[in-house]
């Protein structure tokens, strides 16, 4: 362990992905994308360089150390916020990426992508999972992949998972909000829970946040609902009150 790396901001993200680059839709800071069983590329802020698989972890950690050394103060949280001439980017070249889109709720062959409302696993969720599987894959998109889970979609939906794209929770998310975040008085998650019961299947993706920082915002197109204090504030942003 390297104690120096303990100073990395909580929003600093590493990623490891395969040739599809699926997780690179997210705002990761430092990533390794495997292109063959033994080699791939290091990616930072639209730049990259070839890297052997066995060297990837050491290289990612070294870039993280450079970030801590050269950022201009503790309020610089992410590599993408650094100037283009930062030593963090030494040796990297422009390297476009065309990642696969995020997984959405529903069956994928015999497997099932099960969305987790507000990314909060509850006892009912876990009880349903242990009844059908010993293994799940956690995604970066507030969901799980349940191997061979497609045939159990109805059971998982009853337990509170989102298993279709028509479920309101497939297009609704929220930051932590009050009372857990001192930056806002808006109870974002409570309001999102109340709103979900009144949202229809159609409409824009909504992300409810307590302030302009917009923590947890999805990378896909969405409507940002900032500092709401009633369910109507969210439904107005959705257009539901006008329909």
What are these regions (language model features)?
Residues 1-58, 113-242:
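Small-residue-enriched alpha-helical segments and adjacent helix-cap loops
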Residues 35-103, 127, 235, 242-243:
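An acidic, glycine-/histidine-flanked metal-binding catalytic module
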Residues 107-108:
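A short mid-domain helix/strand-loop element embedded in enzyme catalytic domains
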């Amino acid at each position: 362990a390297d104690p120096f790396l303990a100073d990395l901001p909580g929003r600093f993200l590493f990623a490891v992905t395969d040739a599809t680059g699926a997780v690179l839709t997210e705002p990761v800071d430092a990533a390794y994308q495997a292109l063959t069983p033994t080699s791939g590329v290091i990616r930072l802020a639209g730049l990259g360089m070839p890297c052997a698989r066995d060297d990837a972890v050491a290289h990612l950690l070294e870039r993280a150390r450079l970030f801590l050394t050269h950022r201009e103060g503790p309020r610089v949280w992410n590599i993408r916020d650094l100037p283009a001439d930062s030593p963090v980017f030494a040796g990297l070249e422009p390297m476009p990426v065309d990642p696969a889109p995020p997984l959405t709720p529903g069956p994928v062959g015999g497997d099932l992508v099960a969305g987790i409302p507000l990314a909060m696993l509850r006892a009912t969720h876990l009880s349903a999972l242990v009844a059908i599987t010993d293994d799940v894959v956690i995604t970066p998109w507030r969901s799980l992949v349940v191997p061979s889970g497609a045939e159990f979609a109805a059971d998982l939906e009853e337990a509170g998972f989102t298993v279709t794209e028509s479920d309101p929770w497939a297009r609704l998310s929220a930051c932590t909000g009050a009372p857990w975040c001192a930056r806002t008085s808006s109870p974002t998650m409570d309001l999102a829970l109340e709103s979900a019961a009144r949202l229809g299947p159609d409409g824009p993706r909504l992300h409810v946040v307590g302030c302009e920082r917009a923590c947890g915002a999805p990378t896909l197109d969405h409507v940002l609902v900032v500092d709401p204090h009633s369910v109507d504030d969210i439904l107005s942003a959705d257009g539901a009150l006008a329909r």
